[in-house]
Regions:
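Claisen-condensing/thiolase-fold acyl-transfer catalytic domains that form or cleave C-C bonds
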Residues: 1-95
């Protein structure tokens, strides 16, 4: 996804860049494990979180000034690789 330069992730994690309130918050909802990984509804749960963030409806886990959200979801397996992958990017626009 290009969130940081190769080899730089450890430094960025230690600096808190990906934490809520950081420069590039990642997974403010706690992710799918925090939701019990609702198999079959995983993609919908991710999309709901993105839309709620862009609408400013996330309370304590709200990313301040959220303008763009991205979700990646994979499922099914062919050997050891995912059989299908989707990437969803949503952006807040003015009506």
């Amino acid at each position: 996804l290009g969130l940081c330069e190769p080899g730089n992730v450890g430094e960025r994690l230690r600096a808190g860049d990906f934490a809520l309130g950081g420069h590039q918050p990642v997974n403010p909802s706690g992710g799918l494990l925090a939701k019990g990984h609702p198999v079959g509804a995983t993609g919908l749960a991710q999309l709901y979180e993105l839309c709620a963030q862009l609408r400013g409806e996330c309370g304590a886990r709200q990313v301040a000034g959220a303008r763009v959200g991205i979700a990646e979801n994979g499922g099914g397996f062919l050997g050891v690789e995912e059989g299908a992958t989707t990437v969803t990017i949503v952006e807040k626009v003015k009506a």
